[in-house]
A protein has these predicted regions:
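Generic domain-boundary/flexible-linker signal
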Residues: 27, 88-89, 121, 156
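Binuclear metal-ion centers of metallo-dependent hydrolases, dominated by the metallo-beta-lactamase
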Residues: 1-8, 95-185
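Metallo-beta-lactamase
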Residues: 40-97, 108, 113, 117-119
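Core dinuclear metal-dependent hydrolase active-site scaffold
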Residues: 2-71, 152-185
């Protein structure tokens, strides 16, 4: 099955809309000199769930076409790529464009990805995240940012104010009373 822009289907727990993705890299990878139409080579996914609407944009660049998406859909969470690009290798949004994308989509929570794990990111992940958080906080304080870690769990709306994910320390599984240092009555 191939996802096509405009498709809508159901999966357990969600209704999925296949939406436009404006990945300028993807439209250049067809092998010829002609640019491919966006809708033929890339797409975004909007998951409508009982907890809220999650938009996964995958790899994309900022594009004014997202204004229409933000007007047509209520987006609670936007997940997108972000990084710095080496000269001549633009592949990801900068922190500024990522913040602008969140504003354009009218998203409530922004979760960037790829900023910490790709060789062509060409930047210090902490610097990228600090800049992103500052740009969002100063320009669109109504939008929240959440910085996840690999294999971390995010539950919306409960976790929307965590800012930066922290791995559980396991203390919820400890029974101090069974320890030699625990309280003995």
């Amino acid at each position: 099955c191939v996802a096509r822009v405009g498709d809508v289907f159901e999966v357990p727990g969600a209704r999925v809309h296949i939406l436009m993705c404006y990945d300028q890299t993807a439209i250049r990878t067809g092998g010829g000199k002609e640019l491919l139409p966006f809708e033929e080579c890339c797409c975004s996914f909007l998951f409508e769930t009982s907890a809220g609407n999650i938009m996964f944009l995958g790899d994309t660049w900022y594009h004014d076409g997202y204004v229409k998406v933000g007007k047509e859909y209520d987006i609670d969470i936007a997940i997108f790529d972000m990084g710095f690009n080496a000269p001549g290798a633009t592949d990801k949004m900068t922190p500024y464009d990522a913040a602008r994308l969140g504003q354009t989509l009218r998203a409530k929570v922004l979760i960037p990805d790829h900023y910490d794990n790709w060789v062509n990111c060409a930047g210090d992940p902490d610097l990228i995240i600090n800049q992103f958080e500052r740009i969002v906080a100063e320009n669109t304080p109504e939008i929240k940012t959440v910085i996840m870690r690999c294999a971390g769990r995010f539950d919306f709306p409960k976790d929307q104010d965590i800012k930066r994910y922290r791995y559980p320390d396991g203390s919820e599984n400890y029974d101090v009373s069974k320890s030699v240092y625990g309280n003995k009555d």
